[in-house]
Amino acid sequence: MIKAILFDLDGLMVDSEPHSIASWQAVLAKRNVQFDQAALDSVLGQRVIETAELAIRLFHLPDRPEDLAQEKAEYQIAHLNGNVTAMPGLHELLDFVDQSGLKKAVASSGLRRYIDAVLTTTGVRDRFSVIISADDVINGKPAPDVFLAAAKKLNVHPENCLVLEDAPFGVQAAKAAGMTCFAVPNAHSHALELSLADRILSSLHEVKTILLSDE
């Protein structure tokens, strides 16, 4: 029985992947290098620190991972307005979750400051009392840490949690946590491997329909 829904942020709740990519490319352009699409796909859903580590390895950059990750996050936050919007069906789904008495949390690979900024920009910050970020866990996705931490904070057993994800690493993390997972791929993740998910949906609108049919 589902008692809580754990929401990924980037690419699931908000259409932010293009802005995230543009932010990385802007930061790397200062160093005269650029990620290709394969590199970007390989880190989709991971923490910013892990993407920074990849950039440093690929391009032999002198930066510390922490500094590069912070620079990217600061650029991304500074340019949020007009570049990040709520995914179709998000507000309606949050209304349904609240009306149903289900618990909910954001469980994201993003830094906490970034998550707060995005949720505020899209008008849903006050709808979440539980937010687990990259700052709160040792291991990022595909490790299950972020989802297990969210379940613990909500006081809900993992088997009673439904994770909504858009990326392969997130789906792997959810299943490693022993949770049900619905994948909702977007334009950037639709061609990636999401077969571990319990269901693959076309939009957030479908989540309510499925939960109602399972009652």
List the predicted regions and their residue ranges.
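Active-site neighborhood of HAD-like aspartate-dependent phosphohydrolases
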Residues: 1-42
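Metal-dependent phosphoesterase signature
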Residues: 34, 56-92, 100-102
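An amphipathic alpha-helix signature
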Residues: 21, 25, 48-53, 69, ...
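Alpha-helix N-cap/helix-start and coil->helix boundary motif
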Residues: 20-21, 45, 49, 87, ...
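Helix-loop "lid/cap" segments that line or gate small-molecule binding pockets
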Residues: 27, 47-62, 118, 150-151
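Alpha-helical elements of Rossmann-like donor-binding domains used by nucleotide-donor carbohydrate transfer enzymes
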Residues: 22-26, 54, 71, 92, ...
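Residues at secondary-structure transition points
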Residues: 15-18, 35-39, 43-46, 63, ...
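Asp-based, Mg2+/Mn2+-dependent phosphohydrolase catalytic module
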Residues: 1-3, 95-98, 102, 111-215
